[in-house]
From Swiss-Prot:
SUPFAM superfamilies reported in the protein's UniProt record: Subunit IX of photosystem I reaction centre, PsaJ
Highest taxon listed in the record's lineage: Eukaryota
Location(s) in or outside the cell: Plastid, Chloroplast thylakoid membrane
Name assigned to this protein: Photosystem I reaction center subunit IX
Organism: Oenothera argillicola
InterPro entries: PSI_PsaJ, PSI_PsaJ_sf
Reported function: May help in the organization of the PsaE and PsaF subunits.
GO cellular component: chloroplast thylakoid membrane; photosystem I
This protein's UniProt keywords: Chloroplast, Membrane, Photosynthesis, Photosystem I, Plastid, Thylakoid, Transmembrane, Transmembrane helix
Membrane-protein topology: Single-pass membrane protein
Length: 43
């Protein structure tokens, strides 16, 4: 039961860190390439 409580307390923290990092990455991409539907360096 203690292991289950440890797992249930670790999973939200890891997911919050992951989604925070992903949101930050998307924000930085949109800062350098605003409104980019197609990236010019791929074509």
């Amino acid at each position: 039961m203690r292991d289950l409580k440890t797992y249930l307390s670790v999973a939200p923290v890891l997911s919050a860190l992951w989604f925070g990092a992903l949101a930050g990455l998307l924000i930085e991409i949109n800062r350098f390439f605003p409104d980019a539907l197609t990236f010019p360096f791929f074509s």
